[in-house]
From Swiss-Prot:
Lineage: Bacteria, Pseudomonadati, Chlamydiota, Chlamydiia, Chlamydiales
Residues at the active site: K275, R349
Binding residues for Mn(2+) 2: K263, D268, D286, E347
UniProt cofactor(s): Mn(2+)
Organism per entry: Chlamydia muridarum (strain MoPn / Nigg)
Example of a GO cellular component annotation carried by this entry: cytoplasm
Keyword Membrane: no
Name this protein carries in UniProt: Probable cytosol aminopeptidase
Keyword annotations of the record: Aminopeptidase, Cytoplasm, Hydrolase, Manganese, Metal-binding, Protease
Length: 499
């Protein structure tokens, strides 16, 4: 995928379907953010009477026989002294939708005068590229006649030399290949994206990148490893489970290793603790954690980061069948810890628990970060714009929070309240898999923390239940799967681990 290009010269730019011109907001009036020819000023001067230049505001105009582009969009960037990376990201995501609705395929984007900004050219271009790439995406559909909006095919950013701009753009395009992979997997039918399909995608990545190795465990191997919790969840489905291990060696001589774990419930009916129909209809997205890990590995290998990372995906359906696991029964995980099943709809934490144990036994992790659409309680707490995360290590928490801030993928640290751990007490097992009807996200995280046992490994748990999938377009994300987490984690690993 090559979409974005750089061109230093305004005069030498190629003809395009549309031109995007930047404006600042100055005393509730629009102010030009870059110098343009008088021919263009004549086109938009009347429109400025009703255009303030506020953040994300876009006005669509038509050119004339003296303009190289026949469609012109005035894009507001807000007040120059207040503009942020996230505002730039959202603005260019929004204008991408405007351009696609106008059926534009080629676009020229004029950069504002960067000297007026509080941040670097690189940061501006990175956020511009991320905005364009984020909404230049179509989710899979099954219409007889495809009604999707046309995609932009070439976007040229004017005012930056290719040596600088193209390097940034190639990096963002590699990153978004991973984001798109995550989105496509989450958006596709659960009958297609089975545990075996996730394993096939992992194998495909290992075939594409020499730096990746993959290991797949089937049901027999899962049982041999005594992963009793994953095996229990898988009992009710005719679809075979898989336990997927991806390994990336970017710095072979280093002992530092990050383990990423992604919940891979490819469809969640709730099991015998059956979900209501309205709650079940989007449950193909319950493997978004697994898809996030696969997307990260796609980007990681493409960008060739000098770090070591292992990805673990416990993958299964949570279905109803004659052999389905039952509430009140006790199952023993790979760790040897026993769990009383208080709800078969609290299955995600069970399969993550076995994955954590596997990581501790075989991977010698420096840190473990897991991703899961784990609790509805997190959606109630933080909605769809922010993912909650828990961490047992302040440095890891601080670095993840910075990565989230820099990429616009909002994270909020939640507390691991020790006294709530008692809600997991069981009279007949080491613990229950569900607490009371309060603080559900916290007790879920405390459940996972138990499986670290006495290991001092740094750990973070990202509950992406609200952020992984949106019922409507919310800038800078498209409708449905968002790919949330891929950009944040790549930024985190690139800045804090690539040393």
């Amino acid at each position: 995928m090559v979409l974005l290009y750089s061109q230093a010269s305004w005069d030498k730019r190629s003809k395009a379907d549309a031109l995007v011109l930047p404006f600042w907001m100055k005393n509730v009036k629009a102010q030009e953010a870059a110098v343009v020819d008088e021919d263009y000023k004549l086109v938009y001067q009347n429109a400025l009477q009703n255009f303030s230049g506020k953040k994300g505001e876009a006005v669509f105009l038509f050119g004339n026989d003296k303009t190289k582009e026949q469609k012109i969009v005035l894009l507001g960037l807000g007040k120059s002294e207040e503009v942020s990376g996230t505002a730039i990201l959202d603005a260019y995501a929004h204008v991408t939708t405007v351009l696609r609705k106008a059926k534009c395929k080629t676009v020229n984007i004029l950069l504002p005068t960067i000297s007026q900004l509080r941040f670097s050219v690189e940061e501006f271009l990175t956020n511009l590229a991320a905005g364009v790439l984020s909404l230049n995406y179509n989710y899979p559909t099954y219409h007889k006649v495809d009604a999707s909006l046309p995609l932009l095919e070439k976007v040229t950013v004017l005012g930056i030399v290719p040596k600088v701009g193209d390097k940034i753009f190639r990096k963002e395009e590699s990153l978004f290949e991973g984001v798109y992979l995550t989105r496509d997997l989450v958006n596709t039918n659960a009958d297609e994206v089975t545990p075996e399909k996730l394993a096939a995608v992992a194998k495909g990545l290992a075939g594409e990148f020499a730096s990746l190795d993959v290991k797949i465990l089937d049901r027999k191997a899962i049982l041999k490893e005594k992963m009793g919790l994953l095996a229990a969840v898988a009992k009710g489905s005719a679809v075979e489970p898989r336990f997927i291990v991806l390994d990336y060696q970017g710095k072979p001589k280093s002992k530092d290793r990050t383990v990423l774990i992604g919940k891979g419930v490819t469809f969640d009916s709730g099991g015998l603790d059956l979900k209501p129909g309205k709650a079940m209809i989007t449950m193909k997205e319950d493997m978004a954690g697994a898809a996030t890990v696969l997307g990260i590995f796609s980007a990681l290998a493409s960008l060739e980061l000098p770090i070591n990372v292992t990805g673990i995906i416990p993958a299964t359906e949570n279905a109803i069948g004659s052999a389905a696991y039952k509430m009140g029964d006790v199952y023993v995980g790979m760790s040897g810890l026993s769990v009383e099943i208080g709800s078969t709809d609290a299955e995600g934490r069970l399969i993550l628990a076995d994955a954590i144990t596997y990581a501790l036994k075989y991977c010698a992790p420096t840190r473990i970060i897991d991703f899961a659409t784990l609790t509805g309680a997190m959606v109630v707490s933080l909605g769809e714009a922010v993912a909650g995360f828990f961490a047992n290590n302040d440095v890891l928490a601080r670095d993840l929070a910075e990565a989230a801030s820099e990429t616009g993928e909002a994270l909020w640290r939640m507390p691991l309240v020790e006294k709530y751990d008692r809600a997991l007490h069981s009279d007949i097992a080491d613990m229950k898999n569900i607490g009371s009807n309060r603080a559900g996200s916290i007790t879920a995280a405390l459940f996972l923390q138990r499986f670290l046992e006495d290991n001092p490994v740094a750990w973070a748990h990202l509950d992406i239940a609200g952020t992984a999938y949106h019922e409507k377009e919310e800038l800078p994300y498209p409708k449905y799967a968002t790919g949330f987490g891929v950009r944040c984690l790549i930024y985190y690993m690139n800045k804090f681990l690539s040393k």
